């Protein structure tokens, strides 16, 4: 059965890319819509009790989490079923079909990644431009409270919270979620390429999808477990969120063992423990981020103490603290990579295919509870905007006190969510790097090359060549100057990208500062409350600034791998990906 006919997979690639980007954008849109409605309801609920405010804000954030995982798994399932029907089975090599399906589906992940890139960069520029403009002129120069309706940039600031921390974070984790499942499925198919055991190959492909599906249900259970008492402190509030997250994590561990046992997957016990490793790494990164960013712990308290001697010492201490804070997450990810590889390979480091599958399944484990993990992050801007609504609508001091407590919690959960997103992206990136080799296999097959002539004189069939064979064929070693050049370029790219986006924020924020000053100067009666500021103008400045400034950094991230591949070939691209992944990971945590 060849439903695709002579047109091949070309149209499928285009449609997968578009659907990946579309569903990523749709999840961000729905999350923003929910967050916009929820902030007013959270402020209203905070009039009754802190617990009601927390539950409304958190469950509204859960909408974002569940939309992301639901749409992601829906689209993955749709394309798998469609491609399984459309692609014919090769009678001579039946295991090749699953490799073609899983590598083809990576195009869907590329669409999601592209959308995440634009959402993250554009959303970040929008958010920070509005934030800097509102705080620098309103709070510092004019001396009015935060979220005061007299500040022209207040609405832009509140909108920016949703754009950057809801839509941007949602698109980011949507990409990591889908990427981890797709890369692990591709590595599972590759682990059994050329073997007669196509049933075991199918089990390896379907396992990450089943774990993710069960994770959605267990995330919902954890969401309903979140509650707190009145007058709770920061540690109690953090504990209430941790209760839901930990409950989901424990349940997914049990469920993973049952799923892989029922599947009868080869080495299922060790692979189940690899999932546990992924979950533990995620928890460690979250707790580490919480420790370094929460006001309840020593690092932030010492940073606040340094403010007694002036802003210079705060900046110096903050940079130093940020650098130190990278230690635990990096050690956690490194340990997770080694342990998951070692477990899935059956304690045999030479079994590269299954070892890489273990790293991928660890990333799936880390993201299996994304439904509730993303809820804790999307909760942040909802609580923040609820405080703004309480301030602008003149609700009582008790309400503002409750929303401030929720907002303070939201700042910590936002930092935790970012750390979690970065850690999961590191494992997913490594799995995608390995699956890049599978794309090379498919590419060589389509070009008509059937044999690999290795440097040691051995010839290997392209379909049955191992990961090591491809590394030998392309001379991917540290002694190859192409690999080293790619690694240096990748390391540099992370810093160049950050520098460009920071400069973009600076330029957009400067326009915002000028506009707020202009309105204070030209519209008489704003500071006395007799005249209304032009909020729309500030929103327009942030929007145009974000759209204009995000183009060059985003295009740079897309074009760099293509240019490197054309100049240095496959070794250069692999070096670029390794360098970008390692330096980008540390820089992102910092």
Question: What do these predicted ranges mean?
Answer:
Residues 1, 6-590:
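Hydrophobic packing and interface segments
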